[in-house]
Curated annotation (Swiss-Prot):
Lipid bilayer topology: Single-pass membrane protein
One GO term of the biological process aspect: proteolysis
This protein's encoding gene: sohB
Compartment(s) of residence: Cell membrane
CDD domains: S49_Sppa_N_C
Protein name: Probable protease SohB
Active site: 181 (nucleophile), 233 (proton donor/acceptor)
Keywords: Cell membrane, Hydrolase, Membrane, Protease, Serine protease, Transmembrane, Transmembrane helix
Ranges of Basic and acidic residues composition bias in the record: 70-84
Originating organism: Haemophilus influenzae (strain ATCC 51907 / DSM 11121 / KW20 / Rd)
Function: Possible protease.
One Gene Ontology MF term: serine-type endopeptidase activity
Length: 353
């Protein structure tokens, strides 16, 4: 009886130890993996859009074919592939290169801009990678969506696109929804701007809106001292008293920023009547083409389909690593934006039919 109890107890202890060892092994693997990838900020993902499209075409094409017809078509395709592989092999045996068979590439990038142009971090990595491999016959297509934001952030994003032009790589920007203000600052760098008919284009202006609660605080006997060294270190503030001189200086700074904005657009699109379009107004795509803000009316989808006829189309995306907290934070932010958008849509009919 005692032997049975001891045997059972021993087996129980062994099971517990086995489970603990397995847990420790899993934890060790996780720690090792994290340490291995700790230095990686993100990673580059490349998707062959041409191959994806061809696969979709095959599926639709074969849908109405009989089983026998599908077999014959598949057999013919495999035969053609074998013949091409044989020809390539023979060329390599003769010491010839296959460079003449390689198609030129269209690298498709995506930029969805927020007020801080935060996707610039990924954009700079994508462009750096492309510049290391691109040839003169290759080109870049940027699918851009941005209503603008902070001046220096969008200036930096536009500078990243300028790197492509400096290296002689053709850049096309496709705007399906909006490229306004800082978004248009980026778009104007392109060799060609393609816009959807009702995409919002333009808004070449500068805006600043600052609330001031000084009188409210004063009413409740609350003093706020704003201490500065330098006459215009703080032109206007939220809490302190704003002087007329400070307001005038702030307005002057806005005008100077607007002047630089206009100069940048004029340098990249000299065809524009800058005084006519740099009023802060925006236009829909089909109006913008008459003002030469864009070069063609189309969508990014049609543009990509057209490029696929003669070039290999690759989607390049640099994905930044995010912690679990940041992922949840991003989801919460997107949910809040969607709620605000739904509410504002109910309250306003602007740009709605």
């Amino acid at each position: 009886m005692l032997n049975d109890i001891l045997t059972g107890y021993g087996i129980f202890i062994l099971e517990i130890l086995t489970i603990l060892l397995l847990i420790l092994a899993v934890v060790g693997l996780i720690i090792s993996y994290r340490q291995h990838n700790k230095s990686k900020v993100g990673e580059l993902e490349i998707k062959d859009l041409s191959e994806e499209f061809n696969e979709q075409v095959r599926l639709l094409r074969d849908f109405n074919l009989s089983e026998e017809e599908q077999k014959q078509r598949t057999k013919a395709e495999k035969k053609a592939e074998k013949q091409n592989a044989k020809k390539r092999k023979e060329k390599l045996k003769k010491g010839e290169t296959l460079e003449d068979e390689k198609k030129a590439c269209v690298y498709v990038l995506d930029f969805c801009g927020d007020i801080s142009a935060s996707e610039t971090t990924a954009l700079r990595e994508e462009i750096s990678a492309i510049l290391n491999v691109a040839k003169s016959e290759d080109e870049v297509l940027l699918r851009l969506e941005s209503p603008g934001g902070i001046v220096h952030n969008y200036g930096f994003a536009a500078s990243q696109l300028s790197r492509l032009k400096q290296k002689g790589i053709k850049l096309t920007v496709a705007v399906d929804k909006v490229a306004a203000s800082g978004g248009y600052m980026m778009a104007c760098v392109a060799d060609k701007i393609v816009s959807a008919p009702f995409a919002v284009i333009g808004s070449i202006g500068v805006v600043a809106q600052i609330p001031n609660v000084h009188r409210l605080l004063k009413k409740h006997d609350v003093d706020v001292d704003v201490m500065t060294a330098g006459e215009f270190k703080r032109t206007v503030t939220v809490l302190g008293e704003n002087t007329e001189k400070g307001k005038q200086k702030f307005q002057q700074e806005l005008e100077e920023t607007h002047k630089l904005f206009k100069q940048f657009v004029s340098q990249n699109r000299p065809c524009l009547d800058i005084d006519k379009i740099a009023t802060g107004e925006h236009w829909f795509g089909q109006q913008a083409i008459a003002l030469q803000l864009v070069d063609e009316i189309s969508t990014s989808d049609d543009l990509i389909l057209e490029k696929m006829k003669e070039k290999q189309v690759l989607n390049v995306k640099y994905r930044l690593k995010k912690s679990l907290i940041k992922k949840f934070g991003r989801q919460a932010e997107e949910s809040a934006i969607n709620i605000i958008h739904r509410y504002s849509t109910k309250q306003s009919r602007d740009f709605m039919y």
